[in-house]
Amino acid sequence: MNREDRNVLRMKERERRNQEIQQGEDAFPPSSPLFAEPYKVTSKEDKLSSRIQSMLGNYDEMKDYIGDRSIPKLVAIPKPAVPTTTDEKANPNFFEQRHGGSHQSSKWTPVGPAPSTSQSQKRSSALQSGHSSQRSGAGGSGASSSGQRHDRDSYSSSRKKGQHGSEHSKSRSSSPGKPQAVSSLSSSHSRSHGNDHHSKEHQRSKSPRDPDANWDSPSRGPFSSGQHSSQSFPPSLMSKSSSMLQKPTAYVRPMDGQESVEPKLSSEHYSSQSHGNSMTELKPSSKAHLTKLKIPSRPLDASVSGDVSCVDEILKEMTHSWPPPLTAIHTPCKTEPSKFPFPTKESQQSNFGPGEQKRYSTAKTSNGHQSKSMLKDDLKLSSSEDSDGEQDCDKTMPRSTPGSNSEPSHHNSEGADNSRDDSSSHSGSESSSGSDSESESSSSDSEANEPSQSASPEPEPPPTNKWQLDNWLNKVNPHKVSPASSVDSNIPSSQAYKKEGREQGTASNYTDPGGTKETSSATPGRDSKTIQKGSESGRGRQKSPAQSDSTTQRRTVGKKQPKKPEKSAAEEPRGGLKIESETPVDMAASMPSSRHKAATKGSRKPNIKKESKSSPRPTAEKKKYKSASKPSQKSREIIETDTSSSDSDGSESLPPSSQTPKYPESNRTPVKPSSVEEEDSFFRQRMFSPMEEKELLSPLSEPDDRYPLIVKIDLNLLTRIPGKPYKETEPPKGEKKNVPEKHSREVQKQASEKASNKGKRKHKNDDDTRASESKKPKTEDKNSSGHKPSSSRESSKQSSTKEKDLLPSPAGPILSKDSKTEHGSRKRTVSQSSSLKSSGTSSKENSGSSSKSSSSSTAKQKKTEGKGPSSSKEAKEKAPNSSSNCPPSTPTSESSKPRRTKLAFDDRNYSADHYLQEAKKLKHNADALSDRFEKAVYYLDAVVSFIECGNALEKNAQESKSPFPMYSDTVELIKYTMKLKNYLAPDATAADKRLTVLCLRCQSLLYLRLFKLKKENALKYSKTLTEHLKNSYSNSQAPSPGLGSKAVGMPSPVSPKLSPGNSGSYSSGGSSASASGSSVTIPQKIHQMAASYVQVTSNFLYATEIWDQAEQLSKEQKEFFAELDKVMGPLIFNASIMTDLARYTRQGLHWLRQDAKLIS
């Protein structure tokens, strides 16, 4: 059905419901039973009904069981198991449809076929309750699921028939609970919506526990019948009102499909449901007055007054239009059910009213406190019930303490389910408790639902037996108990374990009905963890579908929304305000459903999880320890929650994931379900820890791994590039020689050059990524730094002998290359490796004398391209480098050769873009640095690359761009670089002055280059200007005598006329007209020419002035520049080319880095 059809059905259903509601208000006197005798609606025209029946089974098949209130009969009935198969078979559809429905219900917009939507939403109501029960009853037998479906059918009938009453009563009970129920339903729907597929599957598997779902859905059922979707949705409406609002489709689904429900059952069911819904409210009193499961007064007054009048009031309130507890609910006006729920809620909101949640919170707070204890009892009972299995006897038995407790627990379970499903408003608190009781209810819902149903009937033990769900549960539980009770027995203990925490958390959870979100976070230690575990473990379970349902059930709790729940779970411990986000509730709701999902999905790794369960606490502790060790783990609880959820994920995906290695023993340690507490803590910790393993551990370990990897990568790069790490050690020997003079300089440069070396070469990228890291491990980074000549120096120290032996051979090839390409080849490949080229020599060392020479040449080509300004110098220097590499090993004086290594420059020509990219990398590296000297070194290195880029533009005829802008911008960068370190400052070091000299020389030669690029234009301008001035002077001289004194200080009268002519003549640059001597007009073009001429010539003036300044300053650093001139050849003002300048400067920078120990 498309939306339009659903909308039409929705409108019709809305009208019908409104009428039924109005009629229902009148139809149910205070003393009248909530629901009339169940009757079977024979109308089969409804597609939804037909589909629902086909999926859920025929009422005729189930009515005897449903109608029979005796638990024994239901328990004895194996028939549900048969329907279970059918239903489970149908369940896939049911699941799909329900998913669609619940999905739609989440949206409150007609999404799927109206029938399927209504069906699915009926289912989703049932399933959501089922999810709750499923969540609670992590693993259920298909029999109970089918039975539950039949119950749903019968319930749908009772819903439909007793719809008004049940809806009213349910709305009433639900409306107190509905704020919760709606939110929980909405979250359940959203959960079930997200979890529906899994939840449905799980429900199929867990349907036995779906009795909760059934009674939930029946409780919703009343809505569902008359307002099927409305009933189902109202609960969801509350919490997800806005999102659910769009799901009027849910309203459509309550067709006549589920036609026959016994009013008794419905009423009892309603009682149980409303009790369950009011459970949170009733729980306090239900503890005291479990027998008095009188929803009306309880929900309304939170007191145990089960008067029919109260029910009527509730019904009236239900039918009454109230502001939605979640105001957003009204927005989906189209969703009639919200209308109905709201009216009910509004009526109740006399109790809860618009502040229903608040009241409900207060009522629930009061009730919640009682409910807390009840929930605790409930949890305890759930644990014991889970441990006991069904505790049908307990159900039937008054359970004075356990009974009361179990009733509360059942009511709490139901209330948790109902309040989860029907009251997600509480779902926060009951989501915590509900989550808690969900996990409890998972086991305890199957069993607690049995008791809870019996518990709600406990005031009426017969109703307990009469409860369809109870009977059904009892019926199913026999089947259920074998699979589920074992799980439950495990889970109960774990639930009991959880319950203890939950009770604590529940106390806060119930204490904060409004803070139900917080209650989840209130019980973050366990509830949140449990929820998170559930949610995250749910994930894990989804991952490992193979795991047993029981294990999965619990673990799958939060699977559907594992990530959300994780975050919320992690956040829940902090804020836990997730009800609206539905994460806690969703987690609570999704936890059971996810458990089923996990049961279904997570079943693939059941052994691991069970085993993990066996070592839950050790695992949890291990995980905690691991998580604690993990930096990203904020707190062990959060991490635990994360870890637990990640454990569930990890446990499921453990084998594949690294998590398995981390927690494999604890996770995989064979665990017997019997260790419930371990299982519980296992769930908490394990569920989270696998996730943590996966998410936290792997990310954490990855960063850790990455950091070492980065370092290793650098080392590899060093080996690949020049293999300087070794060389670097040798140059330090040279440095040792140099240390006396240059140690301070080296110290300063060490930091700067470390980063600069990193960024300059191939490691620039690595350095960029780990610039901070590289700075920290600069010694390592030095080895791996981009400028590995420095590294080669140190490595030469380390392997001075090797370098001595090896470098000569590499040096020879390099020498020949460099000498050949000395000036002509500005072909050095990349400035990246110019310093690396000296490392190139070291790379030669690394690779072996011959291989090293080849590698050095290769590295030179690749990375030290163009770094050797003068190859002859390089050749000379390389021989010295070998020698210098050798001498460094034998520290002599600071003589340049022994202490410094020469970079190997690549003579290959590269495109301008290649150099430009390199320059940008270096500049960006410099931008990220904090040390001013190091920053200046990097900037100057970038300047060299920019110079090479301009040179490539200049040399390449194919380049359309002029190198002038590149050089001009580079000059500005040099000016900025010089501002970083003022050589005139009192604290200026020798390294600062040397760097300044290099900057000045680059700037001077760039100015000279700029002048030469524009020299021809300047000559033209000079000629034109000279002629203009000459003509202008002659013209001005002629008229002046005639004008005499008259012209003095005044423009000639003729000048205006002449100026146009003058401009014309001047524009041609030819003759000049004379104006009065005082007013000679110069054409605009002349001004431009004059300005351009001045600019071009000023470049030459700057070049000469700056060169002189550099020469003067270099005298203070004679040794350094004498050595540099010797190695690279001196720079000559009017003769050196850009390639010479680039290589000279880069070699000087390399030494500066070495001296400053920026590279080792």
UniProtKB/Swiss-Prot annotation:
Top-level lineage group: Eukaryota
InterPro entries: AF4/FMR2 (IPR007797), AF4/FMR2_CHD (IPR043640), AF4_int (IPR043639)
Residue ranges, compositional bias (Low complexity): 172-189, 229-247, 425-457, 641-657, 831-859, 880-895, 1059-1070
PTM annotation (Phosphothreonine): residues: 669
Record location of the Glycyl lysine isopeptide (Lys-Gly) (interchain with G-Cter in SUMO2) cross-link: 578
Biased composition (Basic residues): 594-607
Phosphoserine PTM sites in chain numbering: 120, 207, 382-384, 387, 482, 485-486, 544, 666, 675, 689, 698, 701, 809, 831, 1040, 1052, 1055, 1059
Primary location: nucleus
Stretches for region Disordered: 1-42, 78-289, 322-908, 1031-1070
Pfam family, one: AF-4
Annotated knockout phenotype: Mice are infertile with azoospermia. Spermatogenesis is arrested at the level of spermiogenesis.
Bilayer-crossing regions: none
Ranges annotated as biased composition (Polar residues): 115-128, 268-280, 360-370, 398-407, 483-496, 505-523, 544-555
Phosphotyrosine modified-residue sites: 707
GO annotation, cellular component aspect: euchromatin; fibrillar center; nuclear body; nucleus; transcription elongation factor complex
Expression across tissues: Highly expressed in testis by Sertoli cells, and at low levels in other tissues.
UniProt keyword list: Acetylation, Chromosome, Isopeptide bond, Nucleus, Phosphoprotein, Proto-oncogene, Transcription, Transcription regulation, Ubl conjugation
PTM comment text: Dephosphorylated at Ser-544 by the PNUTS-PP1 complex, promoting RNA polymerase II transcription pause-release.
Compartments where located: Nucleus; Chromosome
Modified residues (N6-acetyllysine): 817
GO BP terms, alphabetized: regulation of gene expression; response to endoplasmic reticulum stress; spermatid development
Stretches with biased composition (Basic and acidic residues): 1-19, 193-212, 408-424, 563-581, 608-622, 725-756, 764-784, 794-806
Oligomeric form and interacting partners: Component of the super elongation complex (SEC), at least composed of EAF1, EAF2, CDK9, MLLT3/AF9, AFF (AFF1 or AFF4), the P-TEFb complex and ELL (ELL, ELL2 or ELL3). Interacts with ELL2; the interaction is direct and leads to stabilize ELL2 and prevent ELL2 ubiquitination and degradation. Interacts with ELL3; the interaction is direct.
Similarity field: Belongs to the AF4 family.
Function: Key component of the super elongation complex (SEC), a complex required to increase the catalytic rate of RNA polymerase II transcription by suppressing transient pausing by the polymerase at multiple sites along the DNA. In the SEC complex, AFF4 acts as a central scaffold that recruits other factors through direct interactions with ELL proteins (ELL, ELL2 or ELL3) and the P-TEFb complex.
Name under which the protein is recorded: AF4/FMR2 family member 4
Organism: Mus musculus
Gene name of this polypeptide: Aff4
